[in-house]
Amino acid sequence: MKKHTGTIISISGFVLKIEFNESDLPEISHALEYKTHQGTYLAEVVQHTGINTVSAIAIGEVSGLARGTEVVNLGHPIEVPVGESVQGRMLNVYGKAIDGKPEPEAEVKWPIFREQPLLRDLDTSKEILYTGIKVIDLICPILKGGKTGLFGGAGVGKSVLMQELINNISMMGGNSVFTGVGERVREGIGLYKELEASGVLSQTTVVLGQMNESPGVRMRVALTGLTIAEYLRDEEKKDVLLFIDNVFRFIQAGSEVSSLQGKIPITGGYQSTLSKEVGDFQDRIASTKDGSITSIQCVFLPADDIDDPSAVATFSHLDSTIVLERSIAALGIFPAVNPLQSFSRALNPNFVGERHYQLAVQVKYVLQRYTELQEIINVLGMAELSDDDKNLVHRARKIRNFLSQPFYVSEKFTGTEGIFVEMEDLLESIERILDGTYDDRSERDFLFIGSYKDLK
């Protein structure tokens, strides 16, 4: 097949304007190959700007690129290797190896742009995926085949919580895909080594587009990871775990690309196509009758603003929302999850059972009432409260402390062994705190324990 070539006629940042013969004009989203002194890279056609010119976003480096450079129209979108050959590997946005090993020898490659599953093919059955993390399993349980978001500002523990979820859920078996979107290089390398040490790397694919790379890379690497997960679901009929860290960086990269194209932004400087871009991405993360994709996504909150447009655009697509709060982290309680702001569609007696549901509702009531009483305590002190309110405050503080937990992935930093808490032990512990069994115990006794069995 003859490959059509074009010539770069202008370069503005990562935006390339390319001239082709009128009959050879590439389609929108098709990949164009170009070379610099650093290597061979791809660009993606985003706009037809004239009868024989296109605008493309570089998915790679542009240093050393000059006008007059020849580009090759590949005739299809970016395609990445999928299947067994990429299991246990660390890849970049093109699906090329970045783990120092030979390139994956894939028999099959899939384009990163795909249609979402048809409505008639979707699987609507619901099953709870237990994580062993108390606050998540109690307040915002995760649905198998659902989408879960971890929301929080900088430094409140999103990535650590994500790594603990990867550790706990991956140990149960199955295939996993971790996609690092615009995150730190050391986090990706650290995760890769932890997966290797724990013995689950052989069933995991790590895809990285780091924060030092171009906005085109950060915008498309999420689709690379998703495509690998879709192949496992559709062709190998497997249940897949898809971890994405961080969805905000995916949105931010789209905003940068939009600005480079000269498009007018909306509130907060985001791209006008924000809702559509997030929707197109999230709609592909679905469970079908063949297999499921269970997605856990970190979402950074700029300035801790839960109403930021990037967070709002993501909320409506999620089944479970886990909100991490700085004020809880400041108390030294980790994971710093706010049970009052976190919720899950799975917290329903039909899914979790009547006992679990009622205990979760009681916990939320006690913590909400404690929040209301906190203002009185701050001004007048505990002495002004009724005896019932004093008991409620002490129980609320015990519950708050009890929902802390030592993690396996942070053992080497804290010196405390991680704990996986079984559901029955969790519910029994909450029942005992709420019914006053431990009213004579200190609140500090409940910090970083597993269950009531660990009370001495």
UniProtKB/Swiss-Prot annotation:
Single GO molecular function: proton-transporting ATP synthase activity, rotational mechanism
Enzyme class: translocase
Positions that bind ATP: G152, G153, A154, G155, V156, G157, K158, S159
EC number(s) per entry: 7.1.2.2
Keywords: ATP synthesis, ATP-binding, Cell membrane, CF(1), Hydrogen ion transport, Ion transport, Membrane, Nucleotide-binding, Translocase, Transport
Bilayer topology term: Peripheral membrane protein
Annotated catalysed reactions: ATP + H2O + 4 H(+)(in) = ADP + phosphate + 5 H(+)(out)
GO CC terms in record: plasma membrane; proton-transporting ATP synthase complex
Gene3D superfamilies membership: 2.40.10.170, Bovine Mitochondrial F1-atpase, Atp Synthase Beta Chain, Chain D, domain 3 (1.10.1140.10), P-loop containing nucleotide triphosphate hydrolases (3.40.50.300)
Keyword match Hydrolase: no
Main location: membrane
Pfam family, any one: ATP-synt_ab
Matching NCBIfam families: atpD
Entry function: Produces ATP from ADP in the presence of a proton gradient across the membrane. The catalytic sites are hosted primarily by the beta subunits.
Similarity comment: Belongs to the ATPase alpha/beta chains family.
Assembly mode: F-type ATPases have 2 components, CF(1) - the catalytic core - and CF(0) - the membrane proton channel. CF(1) has five subunits: alpha(3), beta(3), gamma(1), delta(1), epsilon(1). CF(0) has three main subunits: a(1), b(2) and c(9-12). The alpha and beta chains form an alternating ring which encloses part of the gamma chain. CF(1) is attached to CF(0) by a central stalk formed by the gamma and epsilon chains, while a peripheral stalk is formed by the delta and b chains.
HAMAP family noted in UniProt: ATP_synth_beta_bact
Name of this protein: ATP synthase subunit beta 1
Species of the source: Listeria welshimeri serovar 6b (strain ATCC 35897 / DSM 20650 / CCUG 15529 / CIP 8149 / NCTC 11857 / SLCC 5334 / V8)
Taxon lineage: Bacteria, Bacillati, Bacillota, Bacilli, Bacillales
Gene: atpD1
